[in-house]
């Protein structure tokens, strides 16, 4: 038993010994590997220290090589502009007529770019080259400017605008192909000018040339219309108020607006941005100055003939204001210039309203002699014609009356001053008030003049009635006047004059009617018949004393003389048809019932012999009816 166990331990011990031996071999191998790693690391460090400087030198060489390439490129770029000068100089100095325009513009563009490149280097050595390029570009620019002027002059022959307006033809423009050329030329001139001194002199020389040539063409084309506007304003005093549309300012303005529209279409294609507005303003500077001058001269004529020609001021305001808004909506320009040109005319128009009132009063007060037959005076027709004409200018009058304020036209001080602001002005009502004030000023002034110059009440009454009749007729014949004066207040105010005129005329018959008044004694028998009863003239006459009978006879005789005189005077006076009928009816309404009563009571005073009682009731009624 012991022997087998010993053998088993011996085998295990041998195996352990083998394991230990293998472990020792592994340790030796590990040490060898560690030694190899140390040697490898040492070798790597040696290689690293050897290769590092080589790599660094390689990077430096690469950077140097890149810098050399860039220097070469810069040198090449510097040489290119110099080469461009030699290449383009011949084309540019020969002028655009020697080559195709596109080729010439391309050469200018290349020189322009070369100059930009040279200027960007900031090298002193390039200053001479830059100067040479500037000179070359200036030469080319001058030739392009000459070409631009030459092309524009081909389309600058003055035209007669009236021909195109009357035939409803479009105003002449520049052909589209030419506009394309002008666009390229102007762009090249503008670009080239940006390098030279021209900018400091006031901007784009192409714009100046365009404005000079086209501006002269426009001013010259409009000159005849300006002259016509001034010639057509001169009229005879007998021609009456200015008639709408008879002055040439309407055609002049229409032509100017057409020119602006046509020119803006051209400018919008040639120029860009802000230059469009500047080009339009510069081009029309001379034409608008002439237009403003014409308006000022028209204004002076209007001021000298305010009663008849203030309507021209209203027409000018209407025309120019409407045109300025249309032009502004189309171009965005020139509106302020038109409003400024209109200012003197507008101020005259504002003051004209108070002047019309004052002038009406002055003219009425200065009438030296009135027609002896009670006829009206030309001033009435003149004023009513003016008022009828006035209603045709409700547009411009709306703004003028609103700015003045209600009633402020009654004094010249208010016309030029600041009126109280009406927050909701009714321009139609304001115009109605002004027209009513004019009519009242006319009739009141003539009434005062009539009472001063006519001694007879009959003539005074007829004169005032004739004045009222002409005023009333003018209102009825004009739908616009009738509309403005159709309110109850206006009708009542005007009718006041008719009542006063009628009352004045009836005053002349008052003495005649007083002869038909008698004294009745109710205590006497038969002196006063019962109401509605039959009057017994014989009984009444019998009851009279001799003295009373004589008094009645005298009354009949006085009445006959006075009545005959007034009838003859009535027939001799001049009356408008309506006036004659109205006054005859008024006289009849007063006199006929008085005479009928008096005749009924006292016609038996002369027993039918006609010695005292000249008219019976029928014949008197016929006489009165014949007055109409």
UniProtKB/Swiss-Prot annotation:
Major site of localization recorded for this protein: other
Pfam family, one: Exo70_C
One term of GO molecular function: phosphatidylinositol-4,5-bisphosphate binding
InterPro entries: Cullin_repeat-like_dom_sf (IPR016159), Exo70 (IPR004140), Exo70_C (IPR046364)
Keywords recorded for this protein, A-Z: Exocytosis, Protein transport, Transport
Domain of life: Eukaryota
GO biological process, one term: exocytosis
Cellular compartments annotated: Bud; Bud neck
SUPFAM superfamilies listed in its UniProt record: Cullin repeat-like
One GO cellular component term noted in the UniProt record for this chain: exocyst
Purpose: Involved in the secretory pathway as part of the exocyst complex which tethers secretory vesicles to the sites of exocytosis. Also plays a role in the assembly of the exocyst.
Family of the protein in this entry: Belongs to the EXO70 family.
Protein name: Exocyst complex protein exo70
Source organism of this protein record: Aspergillus fumigatus (strain ATCC MYA-4609 / CBS 101355 / FGSC A1100 / Af293)
Lineage: Eukaryota, Fungi, Dikarya, Ascomycota, Pezizomycotina
Gene: exo70
């Amino acid at each position: 038993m012991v022997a087998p166990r010993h053998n088993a331990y011996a085998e295990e011990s041998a195996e352990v010994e083998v394991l230990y031996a293998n472990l020792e071999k592994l340790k030796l191998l590990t040490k060898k590997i560690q030694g190899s790693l140390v040697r490898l690391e040492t070798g790597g460090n040696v290689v690293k220290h050897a290769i590092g400087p080589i790599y660094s030198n390689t990077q430096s060489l690469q950077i140097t090589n890149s810098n050399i390439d860039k220097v070469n490129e810069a040198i090449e770029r510097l040489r290119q502009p110099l080469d461009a000068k030699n290449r383009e100089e011949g084309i540019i100095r020969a002028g655009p007529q020697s080559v195709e325009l596109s080729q010439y513009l391309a050469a200018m563009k290349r020189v322009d770019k070369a100059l930009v490149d040279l200027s960007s280097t900031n090298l002193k050595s390039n200053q001479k080259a830059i100067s040479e390029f500037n000179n070359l570009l200036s030469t080319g620019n001058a030739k392009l400017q000459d070409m631009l002027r030459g092309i524009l002059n081909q389309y600058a022959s003055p035209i007669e605008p009236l021909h195109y307006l009357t035939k409803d033809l479009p105003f002449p423009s520049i052909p589209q192909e030419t506009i394309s050329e002008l666009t390229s030329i102007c762009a090249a001139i503008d670009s080239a000018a940006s390098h030279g001194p021209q900018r400091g002199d006031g901007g784009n020389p192409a714009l100046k040339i365009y404005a000079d040539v086209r501006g002269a063409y426009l001013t010259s084309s409009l000159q005849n219309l300006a002259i016509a506007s001034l010639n057509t304003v001169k009229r005879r005093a007998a021609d009456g108020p200015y008639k709408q549309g008879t002055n040439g300012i309407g055609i002049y303005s229409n032509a100017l607006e057409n020119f602006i529209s046509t020119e803006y279409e051209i400018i919008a294609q040639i120029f860009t941005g802000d230059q469009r507005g500047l080009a339009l303003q510069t081009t029309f500077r001379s034409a608008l100055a002439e237009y403003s001058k014409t308006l000022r001269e028209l204004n002076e004529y209007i001021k000298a003939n305010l009663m008849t020609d203030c309507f021209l001021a209203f027409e000018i305001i209407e025309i120019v204001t409407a045109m300025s808004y249309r032009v502004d909506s189309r171009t965005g320009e020139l509106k302020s210039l038109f409003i400024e040109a209109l200012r003197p005319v507008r101020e005259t128009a504002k003051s004209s309203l108070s002047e019309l009132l004052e002038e009406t009063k002055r003219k009425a007060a200065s009438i030296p002699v009135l027609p002896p037959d009670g006829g009206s005076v030309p001033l009435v027709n003149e004023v009513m014609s003016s008022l009828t004409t006035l209603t045709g200018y409700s547009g411009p009058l709306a703004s003028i009356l609103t700015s003045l304020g209600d009633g402020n036209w009654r004094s010249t001080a208010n016309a030029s001053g600041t009126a109280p602001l009406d927050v909701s002005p009714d321009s139609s009502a304001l115009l109605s008030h002004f027209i009513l004030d004019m009519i009242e000023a006319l009739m009141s002034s003539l009434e005062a003049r009539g009472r001063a110059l006519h001694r007879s009440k009959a003539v005074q009454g007829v004169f005032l009635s004739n004045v009222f009749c002409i005023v009333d007729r003018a209102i009825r014949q004009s739908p616009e006047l009738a509309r403005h004066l159709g309110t109850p207040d206006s009708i009542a105010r005007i009718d006041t004059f008719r009542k006063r005129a009628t009352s004045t005329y009836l005053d002349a018959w008052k003495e005649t009617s007083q002869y038909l008044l008698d004294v009745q004694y109710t205590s006497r028998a038969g002196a006063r018949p019962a109401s509605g009863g039959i009057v017994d003239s014989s009984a009444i006459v019998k009851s009279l004393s001799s003295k009373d009978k004589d008094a009645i006879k005298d009354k009949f005789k006085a009445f006959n003389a006075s009545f005959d005189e007034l009838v003859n005077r009535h027939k001799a006076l001049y009356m408008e048809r309506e006036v004659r009928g109205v006054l005859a009816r008024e006289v009849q309404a007063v006199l006929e019932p008085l005479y009928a009563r008096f005749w009924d009571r006292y016609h038996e005073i002369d027993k039918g012999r006609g010695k005292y009682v000249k008219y019976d009731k029928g014949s008197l009624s016929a006489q009165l009816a014949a007055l109409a």
